[in-house]
Amino acid sequence: MLTAIITDQHFGCRKNSDLFHDYFLQFYEIFFKNIEDNNIKTVIDLGDTFDNRKSIDFSALQWAKDNYYDRLRDLGCTVYTVVGNHTAYYKNTNSVNAVDLLLREYDNVKVISEPTEITIGGLPILFIPWINQENEYDTLMAMKKTSAKVAMGHLEIAGFYAYKGHVMEEGHDKNLFKKFDYVFSGHYHTRSDNSQIYYLGNPYEMYWNDLNDERGFHLFNTENLLLEPINNPYRMFYQIEYYDGIEVDYDEYKNKIVKVIVKQKNNVSEFDDFINDLYKADVAEVKIVENFNTEEPPMFEELESEHTISIVNKYIQESTTDLEKSKINKIFEEVYKEACEMI
């Protein structure tokens, strides 16, 4: 049986931004076309369906119902949704969670807040929601006892990319999952795998560190265990390297967030016209980076190719401190995301 797997949708992200929700809609047209074309009746959601674990914007909830849950219900799809860290209200238990409280009107939505084995299309699957202080023992026991060869969940496993360029050092040891033939997980937003454990990545760009990193969802066949990525062709973030005389298709950047890296600007008037033309094309936001220090080109190349998180994390790794660097990295990432929500 062919199923669809999607994860880390983060409805209501960026302070329930209309700009981002309109961008998300472009992806969901592709998603639902695949659902209909392939007559898919089972959708598996691997967590973090909503963005804010502490509160929900009512308009974000209505948007999710109108554009996602109502459509799945009308298509006759059963949705298995795993509780992730963003949908669990408390950090030490999954008992209070957004998907259970907000989606009770949908009989087709099955919320998984504790480790549960479910057979889909003849395939036994162990579903593992966010592991915390309360459920860790029960989760480990469920993993030990199950005969399922496939596990799916919202997991934090060490040794995989949290985002492009940064491997997570904290998390559960991957050897805990060695009994499974395949493990499919949400949580990390970039795709990575070791041919047994697969982080599937989220459907769309949300932050600058998502730039030029493939996004989308997956089709999974429960009979032959084939996993097929369906990429999202739409982008939110663009980076332009500016030179005198550059020619661009301004329409490409409508309702997008653009970073202009100035590598040459001998004609100031021409540059001003370029920026004005970007705004005339209804660009959502323009960031300009200028650096003409030719004495240190390696540093400029490094900075222009990296995003804020990776630059700071590299600084942390190279610093001299007795503190646990992986924990400092994690704290900074949380602060960075909170800051992004405020702009």
Predicted segment positions?
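Divalent metal-coordination and catalytic microenvironments
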Residues: D8, V43, D48, A64, ...
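Short, conserved loop/helix-junction motifs that constitute active-site signature segments
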Residues: L72-L75, A142-T146, K174-K179, D251-Y253
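Core catalytic region of metal-dependent phosphoesterases/phosphodiesterases
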Residues: L2, Q9, C13-E117, L176-F180
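Accessory, non-catalytic peripheral segments of nucleic-acid enzymes
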Residues: T222-I343
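Conserved catalytic scaffold of divalent metal-dependent phosphoesterases
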Residues: N85-N175
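Conserved beta-sheet core of the metallophosphoesterase superfamily
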Residues: Y163-P229
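Active-site environment of divalent metal-dependent phosphoester hydrolases
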Residues: H10-R14, D51-K54, T81-N92, I118-T119, ...
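Active-site-proximal beta-strand elements of phosphoester/diester hydrolases
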Residues: L2-C13, G122-I131, V150-H154, Y198-G201
